[in-house]
Amino acid sequence: MRTQSLKPYHANYHSLTTNDSPTRVDAPTDSGLISEFVYSENQPVVTQLLLPLLQQLSKQSRWLLWLTPQQKLSRSWLKQSGLPINKVVQLRQINPLSTVEAMEKALLTGNYSVVLGWLPELTEDDRIRLRLAAKLGNAYGFVMRPLNDTKVGSGQCATLKIHSYLYH
């Protein structure tokens, strides 16, 4: 795993900020997306759904970024999962409120095929900022939110989960 700068440079960003007449951006206009995953420790479905997508995205020349304030990725899990250790970047110990900004900057750079961020509940403004950043950076952004398991028994919808032991 490597550490990478989160400089907000994006090849297409300059063309969008100049005073010239609007020009076509190189990345497709439908590119990039943000999805939110609310998961529980009792359901391993997210791992089964998310892992094949991460494996596919790891074939790109870009990085996979994990913004994980509390989890630590395991090298052995990365190997077993078929994810390239040399393309995975992990930033830990980030204040959850700063994680939204870090995720936005990372998506904008275009250096990452996917950015996974463990975030608190997003505001609508946060969602809009992240969607735009993902579109401009032609990247996937996955907002990961653990569900408090005590809510499941009180009528909450079933949710998806990623086992936390995979990250230790």
From Swiss-Prot:
Tell me the Pfam families matching this sequence: SulA
Q: How is it modified after translation?
A: Is rapidly cleaved and degraded by the Lon protease once DNA damage is repaired.
Annotated stretches, region: Lon protease binding: 161-168
Superkingdom of source: Bacteria
InterPro entries the UniProt entry points to:
Cell_div_suppressor_SulA (IPR004596), P-loop_NTPase (IPR027417), SulA_CellDiv_inhibitor (IPR050356), SulA_enterobact (IPR047696)
For the region FtsZ binding, what residue ranges are annotated? Answer: 106-112
Q: What GO terms in the biological process aspect are recorded for it?
A: division septum assembly; DNA repair; negative regulation of cell division; SOS response
Q: What induces it?
A: By DNA damage, as part of the SOS response.
The positions annotated as site (Essential for degradation by Lon protease) read H168
Which UniProt keywords are given for this protein, alphabetically ordered?
Cell cycle, Cell division, DNA damage, Septation, SOS response
The job of this chain, per UniProt, is described as: Component of the SOS system and an inhibitor of cell division. Accumulation of SulA causes rapid cessation of cell division and the appearance of long, non-septate filaments. In the presence of GTP, binds a polymerization-competent form of FtsZ in a 1:1 ratio, thus inhibiting FtsZ polymerization and therefore preventing it from participating in the assembly of the Z ring. This mechanism prevents the premature segregation of damaged DNA to daughter cells during cell division.
Which family does the similarity line name? Belongs to the SulA family.
Q: How does it assemble?
A: Interacts with FtsZ.
What protein name applies here?
Cell division inhibitor SulA
Q: Which organism is it from?
A: Yersinia pestis
The encoding gene: sulA
